[in-house]
Amino acid sequence: MGYKFLKLASASFRNGGVRIVSRQYSTTHDADLVVIGAGPGGYVAAIKAAQLGMKVVSVEKEPSLGGTCLNVGCIPSKALLHNTHLYHMAKHDFKHRGIETGEVKFNFKAMMDYKVNAVKALTGGIAMLFQKNKVKLVRGAGTIVAPNKVEVKGEKGVETVNTKNILIATGSEVTPFPGVTFDEKQIITSTGALSLESVPKKMLVIGAGVIGLELGSVYQRLGADVTAIEFLGSIGGIGIDMEVSKDYRILAKQGMKFKLETKVLGVKKEGSTVKVEDVSIEGAKGGNKETMDCDVVLISIGRRPYTKDLGLDKVGIALDDRGRVPVNNKFQTTVPGIYAIGDVIHGPMLAHKAEDEGIVCVEGIKGMPVHFNYDAIPSVIYTSPEVGWVRKTEEDLKKEGKAYKVRKFPFLANSRAKTNGEPDGFVKVLSDKATDVILGTHIIGPGGGELINEAVLAQEYGAAAEDVARVCHAHPTCAEALREANLAAYCGKPINF
């Protein structure tokens, strides 16, 4: 292969001269790093590794790059959420704002085409970034056959890649429902929900977590009769603050129905109808069973790590009791030179978490400091209103016996939200009673998914509520509600409420 140096010149503003960065390629291996999986974690890690001077091979078995998030997850669902929100506003909200449109209709096929085109543009963008950063893409399913060797089975046969390091970034898959076969037409996963040919008249959603609420909202806005069935007594999934979850039932005012503390016993098709048998948990001790009919049932009970055919057992990597790949704080597995990030390891299954882990992991491989703060990972539910949170809930702090302060500021008292006609929701800040350090932030309201990022920045740098309260915020903005909540947490009272 030879010994190569690629010299890149970049301006150095610190010394006024030119800094030379050399890219040193491996002389004994086909690659310095093979990344298995080109989802959010994998493709970001591959690009960052290449930027740090490594020779990188990305292995991907799917026809398009970007993983679940980009192809059948985060991105297409946000396209549908945004466009159905606009449709809902045009149909129900524009008139009282002085906007007259006549009869408002939607074209479902055109809506789906828009989603497809958005996905294509972004997947194509990843391919261009690979070319720009000289990341080699190998198509096929990757299997680790030795600590320094990956075998890729593709349409053109088998290719073997010798490498110094291997990074597992294979993501996750839908958790199956016992005894149920998905046809992605009537009994569907989130993948099927993103590619239905028409809007069902009646839809049941099993699981009122992030995915269930988002996709349920899409079809409810388009006219479907949507009922979400949840085993727990709250909606929003794991990690949501219970006060936010309670307020979140504002979705019921929009037309979505909920059956909480309900266990689904079975799902079966009878002709063109799907029957779902459920029973309330309380009633299970002596109550009556109930069967509900629907046109489509969406099962969204979570995801599980995807490690199929990776060959982990062959190299001595044992999964934990939840099917995850165990790693240390540098994302190293029990086998030297093999690393793992994203949904296949511990922590929330979030695209942005995987991306950051990918960057930090490859920096560690290059000998750079490794730091990842799992207390500063935001979660967002992209419904209307949006929900965003970071770090501790009030329930967490009570369990820990932590002395804390809790203060809220309603969007009803925020000038921008009220002027925009979006007064529902609030910002809730939890802070240490003794030190004023922020312990958690929870938002339900307009732009909650954007506003939470300021709270994440504050969390990452260990800010106190006073720190945020003393930062000048533009007026009028919804972000002022975050400042006011921190002001209340710091000194006991906000200004505008």
Swiss-Prot record:
Q: Which Pfam family, an example, fits this chain?
A: Pyr_redox_2
Q: How is the cofactor bound?
A: Binds 1 FAD per subunit.
The GO terms this record gives for MF are: dihydrolipoyl dehydrogenase (NADH) activity; flavin adenine dinucleotide binding
Chief localization class?
cytoplasm
- From the UniProt record, list the reaction(s) this protein catalyses: N(6)-[(R)-dihydrolipoyl]-L-lysyl-[protein] + NAD(+) = N(6)-[(R)-lipoyl]-L-lysyl-[protein] + NADH + H(+)
Compartments annotated for it: namely: Cytoplasm
Q: Which PANTHER family match?
A: DIHYDROLIPOYL DEHYDROGENASE, MITOCHONDRIAL, DISULFIDE OXIDOREDUCTASE
Additional info?
A: The active site is a redox-active disulfide bond.
Assembly and interaction partners: Homodimer.
- Cofactor(s) the record lists: FAD
Recite the UniProt keywords alphabetically: Cytoplasm, Disulfide bond, FAD, Flavoprotein, NAD, Oxidoreductase, Redox-active center
EC number per UniProt? 1.8.1.4
* Name of the protein described by the UniProt record: Dihydrolipoyl dehydrogenase
